[in-house]
């Protein structure tokens, strides 16, 4: 066997090893998401089943005066008699607190210049809710709007036995910008299709930073002390490690603004994907030990953590398709077909199937943009990487 053959063999094995975790995830979860489910009906329909159950909605906010009023009004339109909205105005230099109070929220002012990031604001809000005797908390981002059944669905799910919940999390109506439409499509796959599949299989749905909540017993057992740039993923891994399952509420949704600019989109991607790489380095050994010890419920979170970003996955599979190795080409074709099916299912679940299909024409440019960002994403995976807020569209 010549040196070229050896190199091709090593490259082929490496490509399979790094791309296989995501493919297994997509195959299992996309297939499961297509199965019918009646699990939520009991949780959502009983209008009086959650009487007396106190729910606090925590809204972390840093200089969100343009959007906080809309957010609070949206929450209070969803069964206002059963919820109290606590806005944590964290290191604000604008009128966020004034606008939140005007809309009907109670404001918790938190000014700690040495503490930045969403995790710090959430920790403060959760401590307040626990001290005041609330039965559960729900987190809504300041740039979001919620469905009118969200509060009732969350409360009933908690009363039905759920320890933690994640509502369906979408982007607000996609813009005419093709990259924005592709991001919305990727959002649908990651935040809707995959957790729906996990719910069908009885697995923990995941936490996506917006529209999630926990009972007070969970917070007392596992205080929210996650401080990474992806504190939601970090806390979910802590929940999984403790054997706590997050239920997925597909019928109740929260929708947030897409990044207003190219720089905002880049900042958001750096934070999310850099944070995921950091969690991969930190948690993979621990989850692997759990799996090897016979805890097979840790296998799916491990595969999820090892799964590459979809754009990078497609890029590597394209490389595999170009290599002169027959079995690897067959693998790449089958893998790309599976990804195509996943994308079609995500598009069908979204609000604009035709627009999503048109946006896919520009997918190669989106993939190149993601590959160009890899060095910045890797820098964002460092333990000392700062939490950088995504810029908002002030015209909303």
Show which residues each predicted segment covers:
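N-proximal low-complexity "stem/linker" segments adjacent to membrane-targeting elements
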Residues: 1-73
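Short, acidic, metal-binding catalytic loop of nucleotide-sugar glycosyltransferases
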Residues: 73-82
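Membrane-embedded multi-pass helical conduit in multi-pass membrane proteins
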Residues: 24, 31-35, 39, 49, ...
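Cell-envelope/extracellular polymer assembly enzymes that use nucleotide-activated donors
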Residues: 54-56, 84, 234
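Acidic helix N-cap motif at the loop->helix transition within catalytic regions
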Residues: 69-70, 94-102, 109, 149
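A conserved acidic beta->alpha catalytic loop
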Residues: 74, 89-97, 112-114, 145
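Short beta-strand-to-loop acidic/aromatic patch adjacent to the donor-nucleotide binding site
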Residues: 133-145
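Long helical/loop segments within the catalytic core of UDP-sugar-dependent glycosyltransferases
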Residues: 111, 115-125, 129-134, 148-149, ...
